[in-house]
Amino acid sequence: GLFLDTLKGLAGKLLQGLKCIKAGCKP
């Protein structure tokens, strides 16, 4: 559904952010 797809998208962005922080990059 639309809600689940949105949730997956947000989770993906969050995951990318965590990986970025672990790598030591700053937005």
Swiss-Prot record:
Record-level GO BP terms: defense response to bacterium; defense response to fungus; killing of cells of another organism
Disulfide cross-links: 20-25
Tissue: Expressed by the skin glands.
Keyword Disulfide bond: yes
Keywords: Amphibian defense peptide, Antibiotic, Antimicrobial, Disulfide bond, Fungicide, Secreted
Main location: secreted
Cell location: Secreted
Record GO cellular component, one term: extracellular region
Top-level division of the source organism's lineage: Eukaryota
Protein role: Antibacterial activity against Gram-positive bacterium S.aureus (MIC=40 uM) and Gram-negative bacterium E.coli (MIC=2 uM). Has activity against C.albicans (MIC=46 uM).
Similarity comment: Belongs to the frog skin active peptide (FSAP) family. Ranatuerin subfamily.
Protein name listed in UniProt: Ranatuerin-2Cb
Source species of the chain: Lithobates clamitans (Green frog)
Lineage: Eukaryota, Metazoa, Chordata, Craniata, Vertebrata
